[in-house]
């Protein structure tokens, strides 16, 4: 077809697929798990439409299946669907576990980014506060001191005690975790997020890192370089 509009972003491609295959794709809300091999089905069904290329379809599928709402839908008992919404088998346990880990890691990244941004804002606010001087109070003129009579003996001035220099705040030092195999379940440690360190408890030692639980109740897998005592 001539003069077809071109989709320029993966989000636009996803919106097109949700309109073209409403029983398979969704533009909002919890998404349904897709049939394995659905990429080839898409190539066969929408080849040439909207000037879509295989690269655009592959990028849109990658964005769609890595979104939080799609990962939420990958859960035990969920059924995969094809382009027309027909069931294509129940999800396997390994796929459910993989999606759960992806979701936890994504949430942890977002939380770490927020903590880092908040720390930078605090530092910027503190720096700005040091530069801005407080408004000065208008000084009242001092009354003139009475003149000392000639020949009167001067009293020695009392020396002012030297002002003590303010103590610098003690910086909390953390010891990095060098060997995760030495950790034990239930052990308390901290997870580094930017300039902050969040309290956590060891739940499990895995090949990918250490599964910990934060004080908020959230559990996530963290690599050794982000763990300190």
Curated annotation (Swiss-Prot):
Location of region: Disordered: 105-178
InterPro entries to which the protein is assigned, alphabetical: ProQ, ProQ/FinO, ProQ/FinO_sf, ProQ_C
Subcellular location: Cytoplasm
Record has Chaperone as a keyword: yes
Segments of skewed composition (Basic and acidic residues): 117-136, 147-176
GO-annotated molecular function: RNA strand annealing activity; RNA strand-exchange activity
Pfam families: ProQ, ProQ_C
Predominant location: cytoplasm
Keyword Heme: no
Family: Belongs to the ProQ family.
Protein's name according to its UniProt entry: RNA chaperone ProQ
């Amino acid at each position: 077809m001539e003069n077809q509009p071109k989709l320029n972003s993966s989000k636009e491609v996803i919106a097109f697929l949700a309109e073209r295959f409403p029983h398979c794709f969704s533009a909002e809300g919890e998404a349904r798990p897709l049939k394995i091999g659905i990429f080839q089905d898409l190539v066969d069904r929408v080849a040439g439409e909207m000037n879509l290329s295989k690269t655009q379809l592959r990028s849109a599928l990658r964005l769609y299946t890595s979104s939080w709402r799609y990962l939420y839908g990958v859960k035990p008992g969920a059924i995969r669907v094809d382009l027309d919404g027909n069931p294509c088998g129940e999800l396997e346990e390994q796929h459910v576990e993989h999606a759960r880990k992806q979701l936890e890691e994504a949430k942890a990244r977002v939380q770490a980014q927020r903590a880092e941004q908040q720390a930078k804002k605090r530092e910027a606010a503190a720096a700005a506060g040091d530069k801005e001087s407080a408004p000065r109070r208008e000084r009242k003129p001092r009354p003139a001191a009475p003149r000392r009579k000639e020949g009167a003996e001067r009293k020695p001035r009392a020396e002012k005690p030297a002002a003590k220099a303010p103590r610098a705040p003690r910086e909390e030092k953390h010891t990095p975790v060098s060997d995760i195999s030495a950790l034990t379940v239930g052990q308390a440690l901290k997870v580094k997020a930017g300039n902050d360190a969040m309290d956590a408890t060891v739940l499990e030692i895995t090949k990918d890192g250490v599964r910990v639980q934060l004080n908020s109740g959230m559990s996530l897998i963290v690599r050794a370089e982000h763990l300190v005592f």
